[in-house]
């Protein structure tokens, strides 16, 4: 809207704006953007207030079913039924999903009591349910660390947090505030090799890991009724694939140029759908840039073709965003490059 575009529509599948922030009731958000510490809902509310003040339209409880290469959006909700939109530009902001048990190849039965950390977070913080009493958490990503603290505060006993790698995947501040302050053990280079229980989890077996494989004879048993999985996030790009958006084999998100534009003219991407961010402040910065570039595209139309230079990663650099730049088009936008 600040770029001069009047007709803007936000499609949200949940019952309220804010996305994952609504279930993140812990503080630590907004230190970069607002120079103060906010909870997730407070941070989201700052932007929702801006959306309302600018008169930007949005549809809640609306599921986008398809995105075509010509930018036709097919969606549905209870009020409008099935409908199509034909925008001049689309910004992909679907976020990411947690890696489920099926992607982890953990042996054992499939009893109740196995949750991703984000699902458990929603159950506790928004639905008012406690998933279990004796908990083991696999994976030391930020969500897993935060849920170790949250479950403890709600009265559960967190037996340990196990991490496959020899280092934690979460922020140092979360290790200190969520584990150390509550006396929760962090078992590095360990993974779950078996889940016991038929109707409900009754226990799990941990083993030490070397070179990515469990070491025989190092198994340890934990009596628990709940296993939380915090084993990484995957950009949610079903719609991107349907439209023919080229995806990065490293991040799993769209491959974009310096304007955060995909290989489809007028289709942009920002946030965790592009690549997983550590801080929501960086998501906001990236989203603002994508919005500005989308507004430029609408005003000026498709940019003339020209050379596109891929960004090549050397030793020590896993990936960059953008994955390609157009000489002469970058301007100051490369200040947003992520490595």
Task: Say what each PLM segment does.
Residues 270-301:
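A conserved FAD-binding loop/helix module that cradles the flavin
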Residues 337-339:
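Conserved small/polar residues in nucleotide/adenosyl-binding loops
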Residues 1-46, 50, 122-125, 131-177, ...:
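Beta1-alpha1 glycine-rich phosphate/pyrophosphate-binding loop at the start
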Residues 43-92, 97, 195-200:
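Feature captures the FAD/FMN-dependent oxidoreductase FAD-binding
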Residues 92, 114-124, 226-277:
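FAD-site-proximal beta/loop scaffold in flavoenzymes
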Residues 96-136, 140-145, 250-258:
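Glycine-rich dinucleotide-binding loop and its adjacent helix/turn
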Residues 275, 295-329:
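Active-site-proximal substrate-binding core of FAD-dependent oxidoreductases
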Residues 81-89, 216-225:
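Core beta-strand elements of the Rossmann-like FAD/NAD(P) dinucleotide-binding domain
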């Amino acid at each position: 809207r600040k770029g001069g575009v009047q007709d803007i529509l936000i499609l949200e599948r949940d019952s309220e704006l804010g996305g994952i922030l609504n279930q993140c009731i812990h503080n630590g958000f907004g230190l970069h953007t607002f120079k103060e510490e906010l909870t997730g809902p407070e941070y989201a509310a700052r932007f929702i207030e801006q959306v309302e003040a600018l008169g930007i339209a949005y549809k809640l409880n609306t599921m986008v079913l398809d995105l075509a290469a010509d930018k036709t959006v097919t969606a549905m909700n209870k009020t409008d039924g099935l409908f199509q939109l034909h925008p001049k530009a689309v910004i992909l902001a679907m976020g990411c999903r947690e890696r489920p048990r099926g992607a982890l190849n953990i042996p054992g039965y499939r009893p109740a009591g196995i949750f991703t950390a984000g699902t458990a977070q929603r159950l506790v913080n928004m639905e008012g349910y406690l998933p279990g009493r004796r908990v083991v958490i696999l994976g030391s990503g930020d969500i897993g660390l935060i849920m170790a603290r949250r479950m403890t505060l709600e009265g559960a006993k967190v037996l340990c947090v196990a991490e496959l790698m020899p280092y934690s995947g979460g922020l140092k501040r979360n290790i200190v505030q969520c584990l150390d302050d509550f006396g929760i053990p962090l078992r590095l280079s360990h993974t779950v090799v078996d889940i016991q229980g038929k109707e409900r989890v009754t226990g799990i077996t941990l083993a030490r890991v070397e070179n990515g494989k469990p070491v025989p004879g190092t198994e340890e048993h934990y009596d628990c009724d709940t296993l939380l999985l915090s084993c990484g996030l995957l950009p949610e790009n079903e719609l991107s694939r349907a439209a023919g958006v080229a995806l990065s084999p490293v991040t799993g998100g769209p491959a974009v140029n310096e304007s955060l534009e995909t290989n489809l003219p007028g289709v942009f991407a920002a946030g965790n759908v592009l690549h997983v961010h550590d801080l929501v402040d960086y998501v906001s910065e990236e989203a603002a840039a994508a919005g500005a570039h989308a507004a430029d595209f609408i005003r000026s139309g498709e940019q003339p073709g020209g050379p596109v230079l891929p960004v090549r990663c050397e030793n020590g650099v896993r990936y960059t965003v953008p994955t390609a730049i157009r000489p002469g088009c970058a301007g100051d936008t490369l200040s947003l490059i992520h490595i």
